[in-house]
């Protein structure tokens, strides 16, 4: 695959693509252009076909798998091949919530900041920003709990298992709401100790979010467990 004939063809293609046209629109490859092109190794990359999707897939999977070296390599390949920067940053922003999520919520801030910064900076310096974001996401703790939660809730809605909003949770900020019992029985959490009060927001047993113990999400799990114990204790006193 790296034979001399192929190398010559690749070098010729690079020379033809990088040499500006002459006055009559003819590309004239001189000795210097030919020598420069021979030193360059073409990146096999179809910007709209399999290479485009396979490389971004390898990039995201490397981040998800916590391999910063692989992630930075696939990023370099895409950049060298001329991949659209916005395509890369969109995937980074999605990955920040899909694969890192609540384990490190700052990952979304980093990814979104990178997306904005590369628009302002442009290449070639934008590759530094992309490398920064890529390495942050690859080395961050991982959680897909947000992905699973919205998928499970969406599945129930799509299957027709929709719920009517209970009266105590309905909007009561309009004239006549009291007469219609809108919001009747709602308990305002901030009026209670610790801003915690037992109250039904969904039918019992419905649960979509399961926190992991990865990164920052471990503290979220501890907080939810604490609240649930409080709910049980307060409910038992009634």
Regions found by a protein language model. Give the residues of each.
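Short amphipathic beta-strand starts and helix->beta connectors
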Residues: 194-196
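Inter-lobe coupling/hinge segments of SF2-like helicase ATPases
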Residues: 23-24, 32, 40-56, 67
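Conserved C-terminal "switch" segment of AAA+ ATPases
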Residues: 2-29, 44-49, 99-106, 119-125
